[in-house]
Structure formats: structure tokens, C-alpha cells
Regions:
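His/Asp/Glu-rich, glycine-adjacent segments
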Residues: 288, 292-391, 489
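N-terminal signal peptide
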Residues: 90-125, 129, 169-170
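Active-site neighborhoods of enzymes that stabilize oxyanions during catalysis
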Residues: 457-571, 576-584
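A long, amphipathic alpha-helix that forms part
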Residues: 231, 354-369, 376, 383-424, ...
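Short, structured active-site-proximal loop/turn typified by the sulfatase FGly-forming signature C/S-X-P-X-R
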Residues: 249-297
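Active-site-proximal N-terminal segment of extracellular/periplasmic enzymes that hydrolyze or transfer
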Residues: 219-269
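Domain-level detector for secreted/extracellular nuclease and nuclease-toxin modules, and
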Residues: 440, 621, 626-632, 639-960
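Secreted, short cysteine-rich peptides and small extracellular cysteine-rich domains stabilized by multiple disulfide
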Residues: 127-214
Length: 960
């Protein structure tokens, strides 16, 4: 599921291991270190204190809090704790959200309904010192001395004169004609005196009003091919301008409402939207932006969460959020500091006005070379505040968007004033979107359960359920799930055990994620009972908007704009997920990223020049290429089709076909000595072409195992001798392909594969013993190109275990949807195979992790099946003749014994299967992590472009 792996520390915080592929030698080294890893005594792993980092396995992936260690690790990420709480002031912005939504739906243990407060666990601080000459100092001063940095309010540790000296507002924030050339007044918030440029404290519009310059927004777009920085700047500084709750569709308001932001967008690099991580809440997403980690990996799985090991609850208003033990991973400001790059503050107390934040960043940019940071951040609580209060479509939203744009204009005017507007890189980014939600659209669990007082529900736009009392022996998650599943025709939530959630959410492998999870329909809330929802005395709701829904929902998408000398000029890029931004920010600063969930290099197309060039991972296991090695009599399948073959001498010919090392019709005919060289394929499925079924190269196996390449006329497979089934099966279907029927005599039997040892083959006997299990085929017999080729589809090496209920899904996909996609896209290549993820960590399971087998056999039962469907992006080109960019859609389908996830599964498959598949859409990278395979290894496209393809998620949503 991600690019790196983690191990839990003794306090439960998990930190990532190095990302990237392992070479064989690195893998051996990793395996040798495993024993040492298990003996280490981990310490606290917090952002800024000692952490444990794991070395990568073949594809790498970050482990989450509470997960079992799987890979060795080494010590790293040590820094002073003085920067740790930078992130905690996110609470400032989130308290606003809390005021309109979270505290209006009570949890079982109750919400704090008091006014926002500043909480601190810091020791008592003497505030008798002074902030004179110290306002917004970059070095945090520890107790017992008082502080003057931007976080002192959060810790109640400011010097007594902080407000007087550092939060000045006299004179306002802008110059007027009357103020130009004024006598310096130190009580003013900013200055318009003749010496203000030299002293670095001018109001941002000083040169516009007093010197006749133009506003930045009024200048034409200019292509900045190289940074134009003053002397002393080692690298272009990076300013991250983050906005809370900025729905991507707000950008449609354009230059009439947001002229400065629109200029950044049109002159720089932008995407139609950026996808947040799930849950689409503020704390998880802001920390994901800072670390590149999924919430299950960095540990901040929600704005509110309970840790069963700590026996403590993390709240936006509680003191626990200040405890380092909750925060995992390595945020950008620590990565910078560890590599000798100074970082300014990232987050601000709400009492500091936006104008003061901008002026402070600009003043930091004028510091001497040895004290000037290279990375800064600005955070705005808007438009989230107004979005919750008025809803995303309320006319009241225009003013807060104008205010944000005004602040952006102040920043850009200030940079131009300092002659840094061609030097600095600016990222304008949101954390999540906003949806139209009111308390009138609330589902109450009391309408489904009789014992809601026995549970604790984290309510709202998603639901997380745990027992109210930890020692409740009667608490039965499966029974609760059953009582919440498909009980009403108009039900607006869907219950899941967390391991059954769509894999694309990456929201299971953390002890802070409750076992029961409710995915709530957009525009709806969930609560325990009506008394848990507060309303105004008039009966109206306190809020009109909220967020937290499925991260593929279009209303949850947010904004990304990159502007500056390192970003491309006037460039639109495809949407991407926010886990990828950490690597980009590191590239902009010349840093080596800490291990993270992003795919480094997948966003290279955003930048004018790239300091990081990704390389393809090395193959760990090469395949065997077996010929005919066994006799028919060696096999006892219990359901042999050989006696159904007519005429009898045709059996030898069918087996000889399997000896062909290649997949072209010409090679097959040459081997068989066929006289029908020009025989037309009546189904149109076959188009002679070498490697026709591996259009993008053979998938590489990135772990040690044994597997064989098995060629057939209509498909090719990588057959595992360990798992007794293909790791992958690939086939190409043309637009003209026809779906054919299956002869009755082939519906209940399979053929032995004389290339594979009977000891490495499945048997129908096992399925006869297991009444709950059946089998299916990875290549669909329905799409066979000829009667002879259909026999290949019934080889035992094409067989995989499947629950009867799941076969309904799989057969409909193969029989109907593959043909549909091939027709729509001018042919497709399909790669399908099994997934084993019993510990639901998003990583490929080794054999010791597998918990279920076909009864009385060594045939493992997959937890999921995957399918990757690729075509030419230009549908006028056939899939097997594409010379341009590719288009991909992928699925990770849960392999379960029932279809209760779809409430209408009793109906015809056409009514529900495709919708179920869309729910379980996935990235190719997700599949690679779950299989330890590497796809698309031989294409005409650059490797960074292939990484972009692999990280693409087809959301099946309407336009933003």
C-alpha cells in the first residue's frame, strides 16, 4: 500500500522505513538484519525525537501504528524536540470546524462544549521577560524562559509584552497616499517610511502606493526559466500556502473573485484537483502533506481517536494532542533541519492575524544568509470556517475566498517588493474539500441497534465504532455489522469490518482504527441517536457543510497550484494524491526524502528540472520456461476433461500446443504443421503479433520464489509453484472480440498441464472436499479465440479458488465487462491475479501469514483478486498498436463468501457488479504493493510517466 515499511515503537508510534526497491543484495542484507530488529528496544518515535526506520523490502511500504514488524530497521531521525509541536497548532483551524460540526454531534463520552481554549502540558513559564527585538524568533526558547515565537500562545508561554510588541495593528496593514514617507512609528503594524525597504518591514503595497509600481497580479505572466535570486540565496526558498477546506470547484469562481490565485494557477502548474487521503479530515491530511504518509502509517487517523495501548483519547480540544507519542513519521521541517536546511514555522496560532503571518514570512526572507530559512508555511483556517457555517454553495462563501485571495496578493506583492517574485517557489494547496451537509440528513444507529448505549461512535461524515467499555464480553463486532447491513432500502451508510474496506483507502492497519467502520453517503451524517445531535432553539442546524467522506468523492477534492522558477510554466497536470507532495517539496529544497508512502518521481512532470530520476526496481526472481515434462497418466485431478476430447488423437495436439515458447499464431501453426495457414479467426480475438499478450513487458517478481512462464494462444501466465496458481495472467482482447459459449461437457472439468509437476498443481478433489469453495479461471474461457484454444482456458494452471458468491462477480466481469471495455477503448490488455493480505497491511503476504486454505489441501485462498485494464489513451489507436500515452483502470476485488456489500446482490449481476467494482477501484501501485510485482516494464513511455500512470486512480466521479 505504500512505499516504505515501519515497525512499532514501545509507545505504539510507527515510523517508516526507507522507500524504494530492493536489489537482491539489499534483500539479503535485509533478511540478515531481521533477528537484530526483533531484539531492539524501540524508543519514542515522534516527529523530532528518536525514531526507528525500517529498510525496504522489494517494493517498500510504510507500516502503521500497532502493526507487527515485518522488516528490519535502523536508527535515524533524531532531532531536538523544539519543533515537534509545530503541527499541533493545526488545532487552531480545526477548532473552528469543531465549533460547527463535531461538537454538534455528541459522541457517547460527550463533547467539550466550552469555548475554544489553548491547552498546554508545558512546565510553568516565567513570563516576566520581554519580546523586545525577539518577535517571532525562529529559535524556540525552553522553560523557564518566556517565548516570543509564533507558538507561544499555544503553550501559554509568551512573554508578558508579546501582544503589545508582536501583534501590533496600529496604522493598519497597508500604505495609503497619506502614509507615504511617514515618520517611522514603531507602534505601527507595518511601515510606509522611506527606510522601510532597507529595514524589511514595509507594508506589502508600499511600492505600489508610494513608488508607482504595479501589483503583481496586474503584471503579465512571465516564464521564469531560471531562479532570479539576490546574492546569498543558496536555493530558491519554498513557501507553502495551505488553506483549510478549499473545495476544488471553488477555483471555478475565477479571477472575478480570486484574481491572485487565478494568476498563480494560469501562469504556473496546476491540477484540476488534488485527492486528499481518507478520512478527508484536517488533522490526518495536514500531517499527510507534511510527511507523505497515509494516516494509518503516521498514526493520526482522525481528528479524534482512541489508542487502546495508551488507553488515552486524542481530541482537538484535549491536552493529549500535545503528547509526542501520537505523532509518527518525519515531517518536512524535520527532514530539512536534519539535512542542514533551515525551516521557518509551519503553523500559526489563530490569534495571529493573516496579515501578520505574511509580514513575518517576508521579514524572515530578509534575514542574513546564515539565519534565513529556506522553507516557510502559511496556514489559513478559511474557507473551512465559512464552508461549515454556510455550506459550499452559500453566497456567503464569496467573501472568505476574496479574503484568502487578498492574502495571496499581499504575499506576492511583498515578494515582488523584495525582488523575490522570480526566486521563490510557491505551493498553494488545500487539505480537503467541502460538501453540502445538514443535521437533517442524519442516520441514527438507534434505528438499527438496540444497544447503542453500549458502544462509542465517532460520528459525523464517517462512523467508527468501538465498545463503550473495554471489558464488555458481549461486544460482538460481527453481530453489529450484521444488524447494520442492508436493513433499509434507503440506508445512507454501509458497515465494514476495517479489513474489508476498499484497499484504496489504506485505512485498516492501525490499532487506533476501530474494527467497525461506517462509510457514509455524501451529504449525510451518522450518529448514535437523535439526542446526540444539537440544534439551535429554532430547530435549525448549526452547520451547512462538512467533510470526511470517501476521498474519491468529487466534493472532497481540493486545490493544488505550483508557481515559481522550478515549476513548469502554464502547465496542467493530471490529478494526484497528496501523499506525493512531500517528495516534490523535498526535490524543490534539494533534500533526500524520509521514507514515505508517495512514489518518488511520479510528479516529475510538475517541475522544470528534476533532481531525482527514478529507476526501475531490479527483478528478484527470474522465471522458468518449462516444456512438456509429464504424462497425462501422472495426474489425478478428479475432474479430468481428457475423456471429453474428440477425436481422441486431438489430445496430443492440444498438449503439443503448450510446448510453444511464444504466442504468435504463425509460430503455433509452424509447430503443428497446419495446412490452414490462412484460416480466419471467426471470433476476431486474435491478431498475430509477438508478445501480443504482454504488451508492456513481463511483470517482474520482487521477492524470492519459484514460478514458471506458461504460454498459450490466447493468454500468458506467471504460474507460482508455491501458491499453486498464477501470480498473474495477461491477455489482450480486440475491439472486435466476441463472447462465446462454453460446451456443457467443459463446465465441470479441467485439463492437466503437462508442463507443471502434479505436486505443484491443483486438483478438483480438494474442491469436492470443501463445500464452501469452488474455482474459477483467470483467463475467461468465454473469450477464447477458437474451439482448440478454449481447451487451454480449462487447464488446471488457469484455475484459482473462488467462493461461489464471488464467482458471480468474476464471471460477469469476464463475460460482460471485459468485452464492454474492449469495445469502448478499441481493445484492452488485461492482467489479473490473486492477492493475499490476511494481516491487512497492504503488503504481499508471505506463506506464514496465510490463514485459509481450500479444505484438506495446500491451496491458499486469496483475500482479493486484482485486475489491471490498459488501453491507449487515444482510443482511435488499438491497444496492441498504441504508440502514445496509456490509459489504465484497476480493481482490487474483495474475495468474500457473500455479496452483502451490495444490498441488491439478489438481482441480476448487471444491476450491481459494475458499481461494486467502481467502489473497489485502485491504483496499479496498490496492486504492486499487495503482490510484490512490478508492471509496465517495457513500454515506449519514460519511466516517470509510467510511475504517474501507476499512481493514477480512476474515481468514476463526475467532473469537479
Amino acid at each position: 500500500m505504500c512505499e516504505s515499511c515501519q515497525r512499532p515503537a514501545s509507545n505504539g508510534i510507527i515510523v517508516p522505513r526507507d522507500s524504494g526497491p530492493l536489489t537482491t543484495s539489499a534483500l539479503e542484507k535485509s533478511q540478515k538484519q531481521t533477528a537484530q530488529c526483533k531484539q531492539e528496544q524501540p524508543g519514542a518515535a515522534v516527529p523530532g525525537q528518536s525514531s526507528q526506520v525500517r529498510r525496504p523490502h522489494s517494493r517498500g511500504r510504510v507500516r502503521s501504528a500497532g502493526a507487527r514488524p515485518r522488516r528490519p530497521d535502523v536508527r535515524s531521525m533524531t532531532r531536538p524536540a523544539d519543533r515537534v509541536i509545530s503541527l499541533f497548532t493545526f488545532a487552531v483551524g480545526v477548532n473552528i470546524c469543531l465549533g460547527f460540526t463535531a461538537n454538534r454531534i455528541k459522541r457517547a463520552e460527550g463533547w467539550d462544549e466550552g469555548p475554544p481554549t489553548v491547552l498546554s502540558d508545558s512546565p510553568w513559564t516565567n513570563t516576566s521577560g520581554s519580546c523586545k527585538g525577539r518577535c517571532f524568533e525562529l529559535q524556540e526558547v525552553g522553560p523557564p524562559d518566556c517565548r516570543c515565537d509564533n507558538l507561544c500562545k499555544s503553550y501559554s508561554s509568551c512573554c508578558h509584552d508579546f501582544d503589545e510588541l508582536c501583534l501590533k495593528t496600529a496604522g493598519g496593514w497597508e500604505c495609503t497616499k497619506d502614509r507615504c514617507g511617514e515618520v517611522r512609528n514603531e507602534d505601527n503594524a507595518c511601515h510606509c517610511s522611506e527606510d522601510c525597504l532597507a529595514r524589511g518591514d514595509c507594508c506589502t503595497n508600499y511600492q505600489v502606493v508610494c513608488k508607482g509600481e504595479t501589483h503583481w497580479v496586474d503584471d503579465n505572466c512571465e516564464e521564469i526559466k531560471t531562479p532570479e535570486c539576490p546574492a546569498g540565496f543558496v536555493r530558491p526558498p519554498l513557501i507553502i500556502f495551505s488553506v483549510d477546506g478549499f473545495r476544488a470547484s471553488y477555483m471555478k469562481k475565477g479571477s472575478k473573485v480570486m484574481p491572485n490565485i487565478e494568476k498563480l494557477r494560469s501562469c504556473g502548474t496546476h491540477s484540476p484537483y488534488m485527492r486528499p487521503v481518507y478520512p478527508t479530515k484536517t488533522f490526518p491530511n495536514l500531517y499527510t502533506l507534511a510527511t507523505g504518509l497515509y494516516p494509518e502509517s503516521h498514526g493520526i487517523v482522525g481528528n479524534s481517536m482512541y489508542d487502546p495501548v495508551f488507553d488515552a483519547t486524542f481530541h482537538l480540544r484535549g491536552r493529549e494532542k500535545f503528547n509526542h507519542r501520537w505523532w509518527g513519521g518525519q515531517p518536512l521541517w524535520i527532514t530539512a533541519t536534519k539535512q542542514g536546511v533551515k525551516a521557518g514555522t509551519f503553523f500559526w496560532s489563530v490569534v495571529i492575524p493573516h496579515e501578520r503571518r505574511i509580514l513575518t514570512v517576508l521579514q524572515w526572507l530578509t534575514l542574513p544568509d546564515d539565519g534565513r530559512p529556506s522553507v516557510y508555511a502559511f496556514y489559513s483556517e478559511q474557507p473551512d470556517f465559512s464552508g461549515h457555517k454556510y455550506g459550499p454553495f452559500g453566497p456567503e462563501m464569496t467573501n472568505p475566498l476574496r479574503e484568502i485571495d487578498k492574502t495571496v496578493g499581499q504575499l506576492m506583492d511583498g515578494l515582488k517588493q523584495l525582488k523575490l517574485h522570480r526566486c521563490v517557489n510557491v505551493i498553494f494547496v488545500g487539505d480537503h474539500g467541502m460538501e453540502d451537509v445538514t443535521c437533517d440528513r442524519t442516520e441514527f444507529l438507534s434505528n438499527y441497534l438496540t444497544n447503542v448505549d453500549d458502544i462509542t461512535l465517532v460520528p459525523g461524515t464517517l462512523g467508527r465504532i468501538r465498545p463503550r467499555f473495554n471489558n464488555n464480553a458481549k461486544y460482538d463486532p460481527k453481530a453489529i455489522i450484521a444488524n447494520l447491513t442492508c436493513k433499509k432500502p434507503d440506508q445512507h451508510f454501509k458497515p465494514y469490518m476495517k479489513q474489508h474496506l476498499p484497499k484504496r483507502l489504506h485505512y485498516a492497519n492501525n490499532r487506533r482504527i476501530e474494527d467497525i467502520h461506517l462509510l457514509v453517503d455524501r451529504r449525510w451524517h451518522v450518529a448514535r441517536k437523535p439526542l446526540d445531535v444539537y440544534k439551535k432553539p429554532s430547530g435549525k442546524c448549526f452547520f451547512q457543510g462538512d467533510h470526511g467522506f470517501d476521498n474519491k468523492v468529487n466534493s472532497m477534492q481540493t486545490v493544488f497550484v505550483g508557481y515559481g522558477p522550478t515549476f513548469k510554466y502554464k502547465t496542467k497536470v493530471p490529478p494526484f494524491e497528496n501523499i506525493e507532495l512531500y517528495n516534490v517539496m523535498c526535490d524543490l529544497l534539494g533534500l533526500k526524502p524520509a521514507p514515505n508512502n508517495g512514489t518518488h518521481g511520479s510528479l516529475n512532470h510538475l517541475l522544470r528540472t528534476n533532481t531525482f530520476r527514478p529507476t526501475m526496481p531490479e527483478e528478484v526472481t527470474r522465471p522458468n520456461y518449462p516444456g512438456i515434462m509429464y504424462l497425462q497418466s501422472d495426474f489425478d485431478l478428479g475432474c479430468n476433461c481428457d475423456d471429453k476430447v474428440e477425436p481422441k488423437n486431438k489430445l496430443d495436439e492440444l498438449n503439443r500446443r503448450l510446448h510453444i515458447k511464444g504466442s504468435t499464431e504463425a509460430e503455433t501453426r509452424k509447430f503443428r504443421g497446419s495446412k490452414n495457414e490462412n484460416k480466419e479467426n471467426v471470433n476476431g480475438n486474435f491478431e498475430p503479433r509477438k508478445e501480443r499478450h504482454l504488451l508492456y513487458g513481463r511483470p517482474a517478481v520482487l521477492y524470492r520464489t519459484r514460478y514458471d512462464i506458461l504460454y498459450h494462444t490466447d493468454f500468458e501466465s506467471g504460474y507460482s509453484e508455491i501458491f499453486l496458481m498464477p501470480l498473474w495472467t495477461s491477455y489482450t482482447i480486440s475491439k472486435q472480440a466476441e463472447v462465446s459459449g462454453i460446451p456443457e461437457y467443459l463446465t465441470s472439468c479441467v485439463r492437466p498441464d503437462v508442463r507443471v509437476s502434479p505436486s505443484f498443481s491443483q486438483s478438483c478433489l480438494a474442491y469436492k472436499n470443501d463445500k464452501q469453495m469452488s474455482y474459477g479461471f483467470l483467463f475467461p474461457p468465454y473469450l477464447s479465440s477458437s474451439p482448440e484454444a478454449k481447451y487451454d482456458a480449462f487447464l488446471v494452471t488457469n484455475m484459482v479458488p473462488m467462493y461461489p458468491a464471488f464467482k458471480r462477480i468474476w464471471n460477469y466481469f469476464q463475460r460482460v465487462l471485459v468485452k464492454k471495455y474492449a469495445s469502448e477503448r478499441n481493445g484492452v490488455n488485461v492482467i489479473s491475479g490473486p492477492i493475499f493480505d490476511y494481516d491487512y497491511d497492504g503488503l504481499h503476504d508471505t506463506q506464514d501469514k496465510i490463514k485459509q486454505y481450500v479444505e484438506g489441501s495446500s491451496i491458499p485462498v486469496p483475500t482479493h483478486y486484482y485486475s489491471i485494464i490498459t488501453s491507449c489513451l487515444d482510443f482511435t489507436q488499438p491497444a496492441d498498436k498504441c504508440d502514445g500515452p496509456l490509459s489504465v483502470s484497476s480493481f482490487i476485488l474483495p474475495h468474500r463468501p457473500d455479496n452483502e456489500e451490495s444490498c441488491n446482490s439478489s438481482e441480476d449481476e448487471s444491476q450491481w457488479v459494475e458499481e461494486l467494482m467502481k467502489m473497489h477501484t485502485a491504483r496499479v501501485r496498490d496492486i504492486e504493493q499487495l503482490t510484490s510485482l512490478d508492471f509496465f516494464r517495457k513500454t515506449s513511455r519514460s519511466y516517470p510517466e509510467i510511475l504517474t500512470l501507476k499512481t493514477y486512480l480512476h474515481t468514476y466521479e463526475s467532473e469537479i
